[in-house]
């Protein structure tokens, strides 16, 4: 029986949100280098404000990249093709302030090292999370927030909702039941959508179309009831959007990118970083581990933490927490992880095949929960017969007490 009920909320932003624009541009730069030089070292930040994009950071690569063309193509794809929408790919100013990677970092991390023993590109802590509340092993609050944005902009691109502009935000609150540490979605409590729009639609019509064509198309009917609350463009008109409305910067939507506030976050952003940066690759690996444990039925929820020191290949620590949803102890789960996963950066890169130009799509609707990404493919775990038998027993109590 459910132990208690609680509300939890996650948000998402569209590809036309200024911060997400910057994430996509940074990852497009990364992909352009990896396409020509799989060993490229890239740390590219993007800044945007009215009529301006600036690339800054450090890149060491054999690739030749036309940044002017690349940046404008990303902005065009997003849909900013006229200044009335907040940005125009044809007329914006693209500034480039990119330098080479520090030779001190290069010497300490990868120069003259075997590929398996490449050191971590920096110190830091990274987390992975998984939950059995959805098929994707992602929190439903975040999954629905992403899907609302995705549907809204599918309709914009198709012309069915031609009044929609590229910049939007969504937010979903769900009422959950806690069931022995697992989270069971009961109903959608609140939906928030704020979307940029053309001047020629009334707020009443906008709100009706959002309910009929977006919300009802995305959120399962059994999760909606007569008490569900809707805040649709609650601030009123939203005509001025994109970089004209707000400045944008790479790496400012790290909770949208990950688990929507569930689990934990180590603080490092992903976009614009090649996979020797453990902020990115180790966070992907931690998700791979957590999802593999949940999909194997070893626990219903899982949080994994890893930590590194710059230039050191082996993780300093690995932690597995199951929120009291596993018949195995945390020590048992950690043994399974250590037996099945090598979390040195070089091995993560090799096992997940991360030296490929696969990153721009990750910057659009979250880095997790999409089965086309290699870290979303659960590993078939090798588990001893004794451990397997033990895993069929009653769940172990939560003795650590980590929050949602």
Curated annotation (Swiss-Prot):
Q: What class of enzyme is it?
A: transferase
* Residues the record lists as binding ATP: 17, 167-169, 235-238, 246, 252-253, 269, 273, 277
Ligand binding (Mg(2+)): 11
- Keyword Signal assigned to the entry: answer is no
Query: What reaction is this protein's catalytic activity?
Result: L-methionine + ATP + H2O = S-adenosyl-L-methionine + phosphate + diphosphate
Record: residues binding K(+): 45
Q: Where, if anywhere, are coiled coils annotated?
A: none
What residues does L-methionine bind to?
Answer: 58, 101, 246, 277
List, alphabetically, the Pfam families matched.
S-AdoMet_synt_C, S-AdoMet_synt_M, S-AdoMet_synt_N
Keywords of this entry: ATP-binding, Magnesium, Metal-binding, Nucleotide-binding, One-carbon metabolism, Potassium, Transferase
Q: In which pathway does it act?
A: Amino-acid biosynthesis; S-adenosyl-L-methionine biosynthesis; S-adenosyl-L-methionine from L-methionine: step 1/1
Q: Which GO terms describe its molecular function?
A: ATP binding; metal ion binding; methionine adenosyltransferase activity
| InterPro entries reported in the protein's UniProt record | ADOMET_SYNTHASE_CS, S-AdoMet_synt_C, S-AdoMet_synt_central, S-AdoMet_synt_N, S-AdoMet_synthetase, S-AdoMet_synthetase_sfam
Superkingdom of this protein's organism = Eukaryota
Instruction: List the cofactors.
Output: Mg(2+); K(+)
Q: What is its EC number?
A: 2.5.1.6
* Cofactor binding comment, as recorded: Binds 2 magnesium ions per subunit. The magnesium ions interact primarily with the substrate. Binds 1 potassium ion per subunit. The potassium ion interacts primarily with the substrate.
Single Gene Ontology BP annotation: one-carbon metabolic process
Name a GO CC annotation attached to this entry.
cytosol
Miscellaneous: Protein expression is regulated by post-transcriptional regulation: under rich-diet conditions, mett-10 binds and methylates sams-4 mRNA, directly inhibiting splicing and protein production of S-adenosylmethionine synthase.
**Which family does the UniProt entry place this protein in?**
Belongs to the AdoMet synthase family.
Q: What does this protein do?
A: Catalyzes the formation of S-adenosylmethionine from methionine and ATP. The reaction comprises two steps that are both catalyzed by the same enzyme: formation of S-adenosylmethionine (AdoMet) and triphosphate, and subsequent hydrolysis of the triphosphate.
Q: Which PANTHER family match?
A: S-ADENOSYLMETHIONINE SYNTHETASE
Protein's name in the database: Probable S-adenosylmethionine synthase 4
Source taxonomy: Eukaryota, Metazoa, Ecdysozoa, Nematoda, Chromadorea
Q: State the encoding gene.
A: sams-4
């Amino acid at each position: 029986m459910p132990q208690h009920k609680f509300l939890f909320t996650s948000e998402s932003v569209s590809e036309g949100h200024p911060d997400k624009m910057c994430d996509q541009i940074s990852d497009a730069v990364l992909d352009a280098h990896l396409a020509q030089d799989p060993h490229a070292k890239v740390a590219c930040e993007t800044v945007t404000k009215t009529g301006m994009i600036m690339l800054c950071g450090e890149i060491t690569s054999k690739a030749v990249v036309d940044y002017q063309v690349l940046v404008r193509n990303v902005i065009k794809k997003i849909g900013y093709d006229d200044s009335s929408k907040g940005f125009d790919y044809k007329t914006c100013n693209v500034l480039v302030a990119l330098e080479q990677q520090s030779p001190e970092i290069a010497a300490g991390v990868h120069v003259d090292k075997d590929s398996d023993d490449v050191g971590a590109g920096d110190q830091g802590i990274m987390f992975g999370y998984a939950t059995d509340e959805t098929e994707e092993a992602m929190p439903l609050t975040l999954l629905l927030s992403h899907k609302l944005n995705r549907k809204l902009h599918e309709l914009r691109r198709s012309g069915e909702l031609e009044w929609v502009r590229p910049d939007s935000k969504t937010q979903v609150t769900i009422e959950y039941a806690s069931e022995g540490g697992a989270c069971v979605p009961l109903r959608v409590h609140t939906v928030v959508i704020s979307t940029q729009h053309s001047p020629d639609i009334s707020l009443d019509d906008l709100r009706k179309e959002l309910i009929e064509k977006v919300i009802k198309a995305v959120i399962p009917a059994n999760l909606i009831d007569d008490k569900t609350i809707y805040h649709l463009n609650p601030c009123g008109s939203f005509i001025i959007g994109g970089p004209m409305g707000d400045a944008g910067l790479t790496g400012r939507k790290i909770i949208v990118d990950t688990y929507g506030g569930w689990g934990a976050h180590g603080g490092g952003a992903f976009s614009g970083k090649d996979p020797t940066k453990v902020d990115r690759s180790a966070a992907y690996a931690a998700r791979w581990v957590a999802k593999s444990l949940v999909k194997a039925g070893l626990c219903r929820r899982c949080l994994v933490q890893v930590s590194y020191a710059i230039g050191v290949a082996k993780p300093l620590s690995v932690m597995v927490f199951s929120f009291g949803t596993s018949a195995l102890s945390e020590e048992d789960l950690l043994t399974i992880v250590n037996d099945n996963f090598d979390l040195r950066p070089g091995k993560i890169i090799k096992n997940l095949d991360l030296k490929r130009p696969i990153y721009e799509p990750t910057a659009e609707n979250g880095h997790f929960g999409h089965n086309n990404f290699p870290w979303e493919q659960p590993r078939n775990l090798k588990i001893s017969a004794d451990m397997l038998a033990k895993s069929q027993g009653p769940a172990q109590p939560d003795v650590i007490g980590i929050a949602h």
